């Protein structure tokens, strides 16, 4: 994705200027299946905030607004996003890979709304991942897994091998929402960080156990949120080498 808006955030950090962060998404961002846990420090955006406060400290700290809404997707947020984010955020984090409502057009409309905000905040799409669970009786994909699921996700090699990018030329029901989001980010030149992209190889090889960083098939544990925060921090503070990507679509952008 384009780096021009993130470059403005880096410039503000280097000047010791306070940065305002907004995060929108579903239960992963909210921190709960039923309520927003705005003080939950294990969430990826809180960990990003803590890292920025440590690396680029400012008086009173940088600010964060948790606009996550449990159990909702972009079908809701595209209509109400202005009620769930700071008035003038410098950086917006958008997390919907596991609950896009099978309606990527809603995500696209939300993305366009954010790209056209007059103050042109930097956007980063945060793709968590729904990990596959294979039913032992017939090898078909199960709806989800959790701590009571009858197969040991940490030790069962069949479960590790079932994790994939999806079949070429065939829409994968587990990955289709996530793939649609990635396609939209490429089209609009919006930066994206991906749990699947970072961890799939280690999971398939057995070097990393899914339950070591996930609470169930969709919701990260604290370690999973740490991985997402690390991906965000790297993308924010380490611009791509020799990037030639055109600016993200939206208003012409100059750092304020």
Locate each region found by the language model:
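Substrate-gating cap/lid alpha-helix
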Residues: 135-196
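Histidine-centered active-site loop/cap adjacent to the catalytic His
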Residues: 22, 208-255
